[in-house]
Every structure is written in structure tokens, then in C-alpha cells.
């Protein structure tokens, strides 16, 4: 989260699930819905989770412990990518991509997107 804050990133894109076929694929680095978790000098509040067909959009509220910094970050997690394969169709991935582009435009930020 420190990198997100330092670079003022507003959008995170994730193309994997945390677990597939009972195996851990990546670390869950965010709190559960409506929960807050501290990560060093920042706290992350998972303000919203919206499930779409094939992906999840999360809206995080990030604050520094001294309350000097406050920012909103969106995470898009594609959940239909099969382990060791490719999706049967790209329609959900293309739809998520459109949402990501729209979100980048709405934030007005020129900060890098984290993938």
C-alpha cells in the first residue's frame, strides 16, 4: 500500500483469484468488505464490493495514520481466468477493461495503474 500511496495510484487491476483448485495463487492484500486493516503507516477501508459477471470491483478508502493523507482507490479483480488455461470467451474481460478505462478517466489521475 505504501507504493500505492507514494505513486498516488488510483486503480489496481488483478487477473487472478487468491485460491484456485485449493492452491494459494496470491496473497489477499485487502480487508474484507466494510472492514479496515492497518498496513504500516496507512489504513485501508474496504468501502464497497460490487460483483459483476466475471469480475469484482472494490472501492478502498486509504488514510495515513496521522490523517494527513486520504484517497480513494479502485481494484478490479477478474475472477474467470481458469488456472493453467485461457478464458473460453473474452467478453467479461473486455467489459472489465471498459470499466477500468472509465474509472481512470473519471479519477482524472495520470498516476500509473497497478497490474
From Swiss-Prot:
Residues 1-115 form the Tyrosine-protein phosphatase domain. Substrate binds at residue 83. Keywords: Hydrolase, Protein phosphatase. This is Tyrosine-protein phosphatase 18. It catalyses: O-phospho-L-tyrosyl-[protein] + H2O = L-tyrosyl-[protein] + phosphate. The keyword Hydrolase applies. It comes from Styela plicata. InterPro entries: Prot-tyrosine_phosphatase-like, Protein-Tyr_Phosphatase, PTP_cat. Its EC number is 3.1.3.48. Belongs to the protein-tyrosine phosphatase family. The lineage of its organism: Eukaryota, Metazoa, Chordata, Tunicata, Ascidiacea. GO terms for molecular function: protein tyrosine phosphatase activity.
Amino acid at each position: 500500500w505504501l507504493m500505492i500511496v507514494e505513486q498516488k495510484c488510483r486503480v489496481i487491476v488483478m487477473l487472478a483469484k487468491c485460491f484456485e483448485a485449493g492452491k494459494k495463487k496470491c496473497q489477499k492484500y485487502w480487508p474484507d468488505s466494510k472492514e479496515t486493516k492497518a498496513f504500516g503507516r496507512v489504513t485501508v477501508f474496504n468501502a464497497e464490493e460490487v460483483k459483476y459477471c466475471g469480475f469484482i470491483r472494490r472501492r478502498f478508502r486509504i488514510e495515513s495514520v496521522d490523517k494527513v493523507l486520504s484517497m480513494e482507490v479502485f481494484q478490479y479483480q477478474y475472477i474467470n481466468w481458469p488456472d493453467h488455461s485461457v478464458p473460453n470467451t473474452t467478453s467479461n474481460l473486455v467489459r472489465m477493461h471498459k470499466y477500468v478505462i472509465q474509472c481512470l478517466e473519471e479519477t482524472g489521475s495520470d498516476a500509473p495503474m497497478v497490474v
